[in-house]
Amino acid sequence: MEAVKTFNSELYSLNDYKPPISKAKMTQITKAAIKAIKFYKHVVQSVEKFIQKCKPEYKVPGLYVIDSIVRQSRHQFGQEKDVFAPRFSNNIISTFQNLYRCPGDDKSKIVRVLNLWQKNNVFKSEIIQPLLDMAAGIPPPVVTPVLASTTAAMSNTPGTPVTPVTPANVVQGLPDPWVSQIANTDTLAAVAQILQSPQGQQLQQLIQTLQIQQQKPQPSILQALDAGLVVQLQALTAQLTAAAAAANTLTPLDQGVSFNKKLMDRFDFGEDSEHSEESKKEMPTPQLSHVSESVNNSIFHQIAEQLQQQNLEQLRQQLLEQQQPQKVTPQDSQEGTFGSEHSASPSQGSSQQHFLEPEANLDDSIDIQQQDMDIDEGQDVVEEEIFEPEAKKVAVRSRSRTHSRSRSRSPRKRRSRSRSGSRKRKHRKRSRSHSREKKRKASRSYSSERRAREREKERQKKGLPPVRSKTLSVCSTTLWVGQVDKKATQQDLTNLFEEFGQIESINMIPPRGCAYVCMVHRQDSFRALQKLSSGSYKIGSKVIKIAWALNKGVKTEYKQFWDVDLGVTYIPWEKVKVDDLDGFAEGGMIDQETVNAEWETVKASEPVKEPVQTAQSPAPVEKESVVTTQAEVFPPPVAMLQIPVAPAVPAVSLVPPAFPVSMPVPPPGFNPIPPPPFLRASFNPSQPPPGFMPPPVPPPVVPPPAIPPVVPTSLVQPPLSMTPEAVKDVGFGSLVLPSGSVAGSLAPSTLPAGNVFNPPSKAEPEEKVPHLIEHQIPSGENTRPVIPSDIPSSAAMLAQPPGASSTSGILCVQRPNVSSNSEILGVRPANVSNSAAIMGAQPPNILNNSGILAIQPPNVSSGSGLLGVLPPNLPNNSGLVGLQPPNVTSPAGLLGTQPPIGPQNLPPLAIPAQRMPALPMLDIRPGLIAQAPGPRFPLLQPGIPPQRGIPPPSVLDAALHPPPRGPFPPGDLFSQPERPFLAPGRPSIDNVPNPDKRIPLGNDNIQQEGDRDYRFPPIETREGITRPPQVDVRDVVGRRLDPREGPGRPPLDARDHFGRPPVDMRENLVRPSLDHLGRRDHFGFPPEKPWGPRDFDEREHRVLPVFGGPKGLHEERGRFRAGNYRFDPRSGPWNRGFGQEVHRDFDDRRRPWERQRDRDDRDFDFCREINGNRLGRDRIQNTWVPPPHARVFDYFEGATSQRKGDNVPQVNGENTERHAQPPPLPVQKDPELYEKLASSGDVDKEESGTVAGVESEAVVESTETEGT
């Protein structure tokens, strides 16, 4: 019974899904049912109960469950052994009575399943036939009082006798207008005769159905006319004539069977129906004379006419209003039918005409309506196909039939016309003129219909979904991509999708293995969906899934209207808020055909919010010019690169006072009349690509975001003199390079001072700038933005075409949003490529990572953008322009230089390939550029190494500053995040847990450390201290390169890493590391030879972390250790006290041991001997845990914190009493470490072990024994 419980839970979980149910879910339910086949009776009962109790919209999924289970069982066990089908057929009538309580639209799906069952012999014909009759409205064999719904008389059991239909009952059931017509008893008798036939009963039910539908409010034609009803009506009208004609020739049984067969064919919407119609219509007419003319004419035609004229007329009227073809109504078409020249008897002719004309018209109207229905039912067929894997071919056939029907409608109708024409050959005299007239009218309707069809095809090509009346279609252009490999990159997705069209954005969610790809055009995303869903496309190793995704612009309240299959949100007009319209287009587009015209008038009538005017009001002319360009206004472009920006500054505070109409570009803050609604907000054809000058017609400008996008730049900004008087509050919109503050020698003669921009008047409100700045600048700091000195407002901007080469230095001030990735005003050089950043003034509230050169107000903290100066020709790949300032502790890499106060009258630099001519030579030498008293940092070149000769400022005494030697940098220019080989950054030297243990700096260190190696000269006598080191890697001949050195070696000529790159905290461990001079001896350097200009410094060049304590400039040495400081007093190999006190790293097995091992042959051989002999092993438990492999550890000593640094005797750096006084063992405290060291058989594993592994186990901080 466990299997039954599983099946029940699967089945009832259908209620958690919104129909239509997915194929995967159906498969799960079917599998559960097949697993529970031993309890098949329980399974069948569960499904029947589910269908009985579920909500109407879940009835059809319940039928699909039956279908799927029966098909799977027949497929798996064979038709004879299948137990499910017979069991379901036991109770199938009541099951289908419950099924027919589904919504009206779903009935056609039930009929379709029944037809498929019949074709595939899933159930016997005698079982399916009554079910089809039920669909047509024929009750199962018992007639009980009619219910007020389409599912009348469904609760009967088969086998009970039929109660006769009396004329009185019929009269009661008929609507009032008919009762008056059926007054006399002859008529009543005739009616009774007709209505007692099965067709009569069907007709009765149809009448009631139509009545009910008339009473219901009819929101749209599609809901009013459900497919089943129209088909039934068409079938019955034709059938009743034929039945009345053949009443004497056919037995009732034959009649029923033939009728049902034909009816069933109708439901199939196939071409077969035409053949049945053909045969039916060509039945010999003489037979009609056997039937009483009174019945034929007076009663039946009155009923038929009533039906068609009352119901179909109003329905078709509705339909025609929608489609607006000029179509002829039934009355028109019947006007000409009663001519004097009818060759048949008048009654016969009129009856026949009555039938032929309405039927032809009915056929037209049904076809028009079918066109609409096919659009919806196409999806139903697909859905059905999902649930019937067995009958795929059949389903495909039926689908192609429905679609071919919708495609080839006009030829089919011509066929039906020609058929009726062939019948009229007998009556050619009377019908010639009429048929001509009809053809004219018909051709008119065909042409309009063809137009509608072509329009629909066009829409499908564009990927647009079908239009629904009084409904706004918001079409998504966003695709959901599922099962994306977690290793996949954004580039992989871009490569896959860009062949279909322009991509607006890609949002990846690696943990969920999916991504959202937003395309610019609906057509592109539609094609991508079609193609990628059909094949098995892989990204990485996984086959992706793809589907429509709800676009961002549709808010939560509208999500209920989302249709995932069509990728469209159908929002009823009455639910749409006009304010939300603009937002809908984000990640999608609005189908213009579905927009309510009233909304546009509502939007147009809303007053345009005028910009807040400053003291100077704009000229009226300007206003008009903006209005005239309204027609050309396009919506502002969405930033194509999707760069996150800070919240946009309100437009109110950005408006400059006025700008002359002749200006080619509107000023930065100007906010014109908003664009007309419903235009797609993505690609703006009126704007040039990024990097070009804007067109002369001012396109619309959105308020620029507070932060520009990050673009690497390599332009030079001249130092500006900013006097405190010039520093005033200004609006963001006009913060530009103030020409008055550029030194006269820097501005070329072609650009007179004053023509850069038109500053705002002083009447601008003063709250603006603090309002902008307060987000980013810490509150305790003095923020003084820069203002340009007053410039005559008549000045015009220089505009120059993008390709022109210019020697004038400053080209023009660029509008903030010329394109989506240049949002900052600035100066453009002549030959800057599109991706270059804009250089120039920047508002003070820029974030750290913006990477744009900016003017830094004197007292603003380093947290906001600072002015960085970059040499002319060097590209800067890091995206941050600026040098890491010596004492800025954040790792963010701020732009760390500031302009000096006075103007620098330096000679212009004359480099041929210079990007920006006529800018001053920025020769960076200490003391060359006067330092302002305010700035804390020297003005250094960022991005490339500064001169190699200069050690970091303030690291050496002032007396030791040498003259500059060459063009290479002093120190480590690369901020901590950019470590080579991804080694984690070391904390800096201030972080020693116990500040008392910190070693004094400078010369004091020499006195304190008694165990220095006196082979080195004292620090005062050093020479060549700043000579650039030689980048030259040599190794001991004959010693195999240790595999651990592989990843650590620097590139041979990379001057950015002068020594080996750091390997997490592996610098000075327990044992002192190899002395550099000793190492040189090994390499064949004679000791008397001075350190050469290209000698390779083997030492680490990053300072070791010391925890805690504030940092001074001297201690922030990690940044500047790249230089060759051979005699560095602190982290040199001989400073045993320093090394011992700082480090607690027991598990480090890299550099220090290599250096120690290589230091000299005697020491190397001695270590090997110790590791290899019995004596060494005997002492394991006292002193250290040696690995068996000499390469991994030569030896291992106790914690540095437990040794005294100063009184350990030393011979040549060797600790001779190493074995005599064993330090306390750390390893018993840390069993994990003990195992790790002891199991050094895993040497090879550990050599290649990751840095992360070492980190996680290595550091053991024994703070409790620190004082001993």
UniProtKB/Swiss-Prot annotation:
Question: What is a single molecular function from GO for this protein?
Answer: RNA polymerase II C-terminal domain phosphoserine binding
Q: Where is the composition biased (Basic and acidic residues)?
A: 270-283, 447-461
Q: Which one GO biological process term can you cite for this protein?
A: positive regulation of DNA-templated transcription, elongation
Keywords linked to the UniProt accession:
Isopeptide bond, Methylation, Nucleus, Phosphoprotein, RNA-binding, Transcription, Transcription regulation, Ubl conjugation
Question: Subunit notes for this chain?
Answer: Interacts with POLR2A; via C-terminal heptapeptide repeat domain (CTD) phosphorylated at 'Ser-2' and 'Ser-5'. Identified in a complex with CDC5L and other spliceosomal proteins.
Record PTM Phosphoserine, positions in chain: S273, S617
- Chain residue numbers at which the record places covalent cross-link Glycyl lysine isopeptide (Lys-Gly) (interchain with G-Cter in SUMO1): K18
What positions are modified (Asymmetric dimethylarginine)?
R915, R925, R936, R1071
Start and end residues of each CID domain: 1-139
Q: Which PANTHER family match?
A: RNA PROCESSING PROTEIN LD23810P (PTHR23140), SR-RELATED CTD ASSOCIATED FACTOR 8 (PTHR23140:SF1)
Q: Which residues carry this modification: Phosphothreonine?
A: T6
Q: Predominant location of this chain?
A: nucleus
Compositionally biased region (Polar residues): 327-354
Domain RRM, residue spans: 477-551
- Name any GO cellular component annotation: nuclear matrix
The scientific name of the source species is Mus musculus (Mouse)
Tell me the function of this protein: Anti-terminator protein required to prevent early mRNA termination during transcription. Together with SCAF4, acts by suppressing the use of early, alternative poly(A) sites, thereby preventing the accumulation of non-functional truncated proteins. Mechanistically, associates with the phosphorylated C-terminal heptapeptide repeat domain (CTD) of the largest RNA polymerase II subunit (POLR2A), and subsequently binds nascent RNA upstream of early polyadenylation sites to prevent premature mRNA transcript cleavage and polyadenylation.
Q: Where is the composition biased (Basic residues)?
A: 394-443
Q: Which residue ranges have biased composition labelled Low complexity?
A: 1249-1262
Protein name stated in the entry: SR-related and CTD-associated factor 8
